[in-house]
Amino acid sequence: MVATVASNRSNGNSTRHQAHPSRAGGLSSFKSEIDRQDPTKTFLPGLHLYAAERAAAAEPRERDDEFYFLAFRLHDDFVTQYRDRQPKWGFPIGAGNTLGEYNFLTKYSRKKLNGSKERFYEMVRRVIEGMFSIQKEHALRHKLPWNENKAHTSAQEAFDRLFTGKWSPPGRGLWMMGTFFVNGLHDSSALQNCGFLSTAFIADGDDPAFPFYRLMEMSMLGVGVGFDTRGANTMQLYQPIENNHEPIIVDDSREGWVESARMLIESYLLPDRDAVVFDYSEIRLAGAPIGGFGGTAAGPEPLIQLHDRLRKLLNYRQGEFLTSSDIVDIGNMVGKCVVAANVRSSAEIALGVADDEAFLNLKNAMVNPERMGYVRGPDGGPLVGEDEKWVESEQGGWGYTSNNSVLAEVGGNYDHLAKGIVMNGEPGIFWIDLCQQRGRLADPRNDRDYRVMGVNPCGEQPLENNELCTLVEIYPTNCRDFMDYKRTLKFAYLYGKTVTLLPTHWPETNEVMTRNRRIGTSMTGLAEFVEEHGWFELRKWQDEGYQEIRRWDGIYSEWLGVRESIKVTTIKPSGTVSLVFGVTPGCHWPKERGQYFRTVRENVGNPVADAMREAGYHVEPNVQNPEFGLVITCPAKGPDIRGEREVSLWEKVALAAQCQEWWSDNSVSITATYDPDTEASQIPAVIRAFDGKVKALSFLAAQEGIYAQAPYQRVSPEVFQEAWDKVKPVDWERLYAGEAWEGAGEAYCTTDACEVPV
């Protein structure tokens, strides 16, 4: 049998037969389906790149009960009460169809053993049974009291409140909770939305590539990643030694791809390392089907391109130090590889310092045309073609894969950032000292979170190095009244706390998360709430609701024998989950008032797209990916409240500030849109006014016609009505019966603005 290269720690040539446990995925023990017999080749090991395929093949399937691994099961007679009840789907799109059901079917409904798709009540059952199974196993494992009857009473109430749209896990929880990936493997990685990795320690040990390859692994698992540039100018670069070794075969696997990136980056960060050359022959070709998800593989080209770009960036720089630009470039190149590989979308945030001009100019195409996908001209700026437009590079850029923000401190002067913000919306601002010192701003300084080093890509969760986000959300506008809302908080909180009981497969992450037990219970639909009930009523719900969550955290932490959570509340941006439950996202006002066109994206050949076309919706090729992508345009009706163009920049940030004061002890995700003609000049004043009142702040110009097939499009009443009258009911039954592809799940905690679409 061939040797398996998993580490190159000693001299660049050592060979080991087993992957390092800190890098091994929860499924890493599964045997590869490919029998490799060529003794001249060295393999990189790993979990299959398309993890659903590998896990499905490895999971025991001889049992009739596909949920045999769950320790807690609801009674059938209780669940069947909901079988014929229609969920309150959000956002009508004509003829009784809704964006809510569309998003549920395409993202969160899993295929069952018989080939059909989960109905909504079945998904709710899976989530609740998975949640209470974790609690039960924890209690029994630690010999703690467990009352089955009491658990059933609680689980039934949690079920009903989820079914009626009063709370929900984030999209990743709807997709993964109660599955073999989570409950069968006792691994919470698939439930985590985002994380943070610091480069501050890259020069301290023998694993300087760690933040870069861990970023790649997290991204390939759908975890959005924040990272910083603290390691800039601490790590000397070296030139690998050309020794003409045999090529190393890269396995068609997540770990194989990640390990190849580690080996290549490390060869430039440690002395006396051999240059590495790879053989990509085992990676499935472009266009090959991806089992389960129904998409197609991108082939080895994205990985080849990543390796080539990394070599071009780091070659022949011996004696130089790794710069902040290098750190961001490596992170962005990894993000582009993940996007291009059709594995996941990518969400990254890079945190730099406010006086680093190189960092601030990373997305300035006049200074860095290659990063933004343009050919550099003789004057150093973008090359201008005969059509007077900038010439695009064949391979495209990579700088777009992260949102870039600066680490700030309260009282600093950040007026100089406004120019970049107006130009491209960046940088955002993250007040690191406020995150370390304060929880809710209504409460006194406590310095409990002094270890915080960064934030997740959407800005709602301050995090330590290697820490992940555990999120959950509640929908106040779907609750009957304050007491109904207050009761619902118990079950939303309990979901988040339950997820903290499961480890990930990363020891470095478990060390932090078991100490902090950080969760983020988010309120969603707040603009709607304010428009209907007013700001003071929201303040009451937030303040008393926060106290209620803290009360429950004391009770459940004591029973479970774990620490109380360091922080418990947040405001996440929300995304497709808010569409399912029919509320506005996070603390943002809707893009449009009342009615508008909403576009959604599907792959060519997806039966859902065919069903939508047959129902009268406009379906056309995706202009960004016409060979494989489709765009469906839906006439959508949302809440009849002010759209974001009708709300001032100041009011938007003020709502975030109230949430930071009275609800969120973590942070608040706020992307404040502004009118570029009338409000751009006010940005410095807004930053100064809310300095010390929010922990994170980013801006985005509100412009019409920014790009073709935009997610939200304003149309005239006549055009809207014509499209509305044209559609007929979608044949959902045939899709639920099994025609629809496996759900895609949801990455991160994002709105459409946070992730780079595949």
Feature annotation, model-predicted:
Residues V2-V758:
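Extended catalytic cores of very large enzyme megasubunits
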